[in-house]
Amino acid sequence: MGVNDLWQILEPVKQHIPLRNLGGKTIAVDLSLWVCEAQTVKKMMGSVMKPHLRNLFFRISYLTQMDVKLVFVMEGEPPKLKADVISKRNQSRYGSSGKSWSQKTGRSHFKSVLRECLHMLECLGIPWVQAAGEAEAMCAYLNAGGHVDGCLTNDGDTFLYGAQTVYRNFTMNTKDPHVDCYTMSSIKSKLGLDRDALVGLAILLGCDYLPKGVPGVGKEQALKLIQILKGQSLLQRFNRWNETSCNSSPQLLVTKKLAHCSVCSHPGSPKDHERNGCRLCKSDKYCEPHDYEYCCPCEWHRTEHDRQLSEVENNIKKKACCCEGFPFHEVIQEFLLNKDKLVKVIRYQRPDLLLFQRFTLEKMEWPNHYACEKLLVLLTHYDMIERKLGSRNSNQLQPIRIVKTRIRNGVHCFEIEWEKPEHYAMEDKQHGEFALLTIEEESLFEAAYPEIVAVYQKQKLEIKGKKQKRIKPKENNLPEPDEVMSFQSHMTLKPTCEIFHKQNSKLNSGISPDPTLPQESISASLNSLLLPKNTPCLNAQEQFMSSLRPLAIQQIKAVSKSLISESSQPNTSSHNISVIADLHLSTIDWEGTSFSNSPAIQRNTFSHDLKSEVESELSAIPDGFENIPEQLSCESERYTANIKKVLDEDSDGISPEEHLLSGITDLCLQDLPLKERIFTKLSYPQDNLQPDVNLKTLSILSVKESCIANSGSDCTSHLSKDLPGIPLQNESRDSKILKGDQLLQEDYKVNTSVPYSVSNTVVKTCNVRPPNTALDHSRKVDMQTTRKILMKKSVCLDRHSSDEQSAPVFGKAKYTTQRMKHSSQKHNSSHFKESGHNKLSSPKIHIKETEQCVRSYETAENEESCFPDSTKSSLSSLQCHKKENNSGTCLDSPLPLRQRLKLRFQST
């Protein structure tokens, strides 16, 4: 069909167009093309009645839902030039007949098939037009006149009739529904072919009216001829060939070929160009090289090129002139002269439901309910288009509601329930529950029925609001895990309680202040968990931190459980024979009233007492945070009141800072034995008191000396167990990052390891503050604190290095202090309540003793400044300090501190 090899020539301009892109366009369809395609499908033959009608209906329904308007073209009387082609087609389809082919030029059978299709188009309301001759000629006429946007046909003759856009290879598969598009503008711009050239190709290559064309001429020679003409009309060249004799050809002047340079391809030799230059290259010497495709502009090359082109044209001319009737003016007139006219205006009508039921039942044997179901989509689409354009009447379908939203082929749609239209047939089984449902595009339905869409959107919002109200609030108001992690990352909790083992402590986690939480809960919770009632031994920083942040109950329970498990394990290593020998137990009157508790039972009773206390505290802790702030704030106020009593008695003539520090000093020095307090009075002057110095450091040093004197071998026995738990701290004096509070916490734990001595364990509250603030506020004092702490560690090293069983290693000394602290926790806990009551009975005496100790310790600090290394200086200064103050040994006594204080109060 059409021009031979035309689609192969037009292949470079083919475009792949999805059917969705045809939406909104009007397409002229060659009806005979679709009928022939349906008849060639072998699977439909015999299994489907009237396959051409079924194929036509479903294609129309598919394209109509895509908003593609169709105009079908009916074949007219074929021209006589096509009689030979029609006869051969009929013979191939229906077999040979006895009549002559020249007498049978009509399409009686094919026209009867087309009439059935036209009857269906009338039932569907689709317009169709009658062509005068060929259907493709009418399609081209409609396209050229602007009545349609393109022509849907596989016949290439459409371009020869004047069509501008042709759609070919209509495909309706689910994966890729598309058509191939060819436009006349792209053919002319890319291939250089216009309508005259295409008609000339039809004559040379062959078409329906001239099946053989010019024998011996193929598409390559024909295209080369068109290129030789350079835009000249091919049909005019045919007429010129006909006017002149076919055997005559213009004689070209023969010129002699000159020698050409191998470098520039110009006449002359390379040596000549090297000496004299090239005239065509416009050079005095040498010449310019050119590529292989360069054509020399000399006279011989021009004549040679013309000769070659003329040979191609002469060859085609000879073959064309040999054909009888060339240049076939009848064929040229068939393509160029228009015979078609538009008789009636193209109009679309509403599908007729009753007429369609009758037609499909008669021709296709469709049941009425099936025909109504298939036609409903076309009815709703037509009514929506009319309402969108502003035309409304009572016959239009009315939607009941929007069932739900759908997505079809990537397009947002609504599932619509419609009212039953007139003459709509239903299946017998559907009378009970019947609903007319279709899926329509959201944009089109909203434009046609905006009020229905508004109601649906309102109902959707109401349902969404009800669902949100039904959501119950979470019963558990605990923060989310992400919030807890963010909360803990800004927290700095520094527990310095003496009874907590550093390695197993669960309180060394950072806590940041939160303004929304009560500030008294942490302080009170820790005090209620760790301290017995009426314990006066508080850290100095409790007076500065009036309130702390709440601590998670889970952390408190975890810490308490670890303490119970740790305290329940017996520590047999503390009963060392060397330690007992150094205590001089033979000189003690065991029958007297000097000891309130038996030393033999002290270690065993501690673990049970501590375990019972911790378990009682854990049982009192609720699961939430409702009652904790009030309970804990009461405990904090009780301890703060005891501290204020000490400060109020000696506040005359002293600044608030000095007054506060002096009260702290009393709390720190009251833990020292009587020997150490008298020892510090006699060894240091009274006029070097500096309140800014860490007063806890002096008490730590003094108690440590007592600890070392009584537990030398006991410390050595624990060197090989807990060393990994304590990190070494070898920082120099210039370190500004090491915090004094942390060093005090680590060193002060050592001081409680005095066996069989009644000394209160000082429980320090948590220093809760931001890390940067804590570092900035304590930089000035941290330098002095760091040096003193390191010096005190050296004292412990000096004492233990003298033992035969211990090695002079600083790490072992630190390990020893850890075990000393751990062993002292067990037998000192039972004296919390008893010793705490008597300590605050004489605040004035303790304050005076503290002032003397501070002045004395400042002198020792000045002596240590001459040593560059902190460890060596602390060792030497302590040894000199011991030698010069042997006078205080006369006050040595084996009695515990509590009994000595008791005797002193009686004497005064």
UniProtKB/Swiss-Prot annotation:
State any GO BP term from the record: replication fork processing
Q: Which residues carry this modification: Phosphoserine?
A: 801-802
Q: Where is this region: 5'-3' exonuclease domain?
A: 208-384
What cofactor does this protein call for?
Mg(2+)
Q: Which InterPro entries match?
A: 5-3_exonuclease_C_sf, GEN_chromo, HhH2, PIN-like_dom_sf, XPG-I_dom, XPG/Rad2, XPG_DNA_repair_N
- Please describe, based on the UniProt annotation, the reported consequence of changing residue 30 to N: Abolishes endonuclease activity on both Hollyday junctions and 5' flap substrates
The reported result of mutating residue 275 to L is:
In a breast cancer sample; somatic mutation
A cellular component term from Gene Ontology for this protein is:
nucleoplasm
- EC code(s) of this entry: 3.1.-.-
What role does this protein play? Endonuclease which resolves Holliday junctions (HJs) by the introduction of symmetrically related cuts across the junction point, to produce nicked duplex products in which the nicks can be readily ligated. Four-way DNA intermediates, also known as Holliday junctions, are formed during homologous recombination and DNA repair, and their resolution is necessary for proper chromosome segregation. Cleaves HJs by a nick and counter-nick mechanism involving dual coordinated incisions that lead to the formation of ligatable nicked duplex products.
Q: How does it assemble?
A: Largely monomeric, dimerizes on the Holliday junction and the first nick occurs upon dimerization at the junction.
Q: Per its record, how is this protein called by name?
A: Flap endonuclease GEN homolog 1
- Gene designation: GEN1
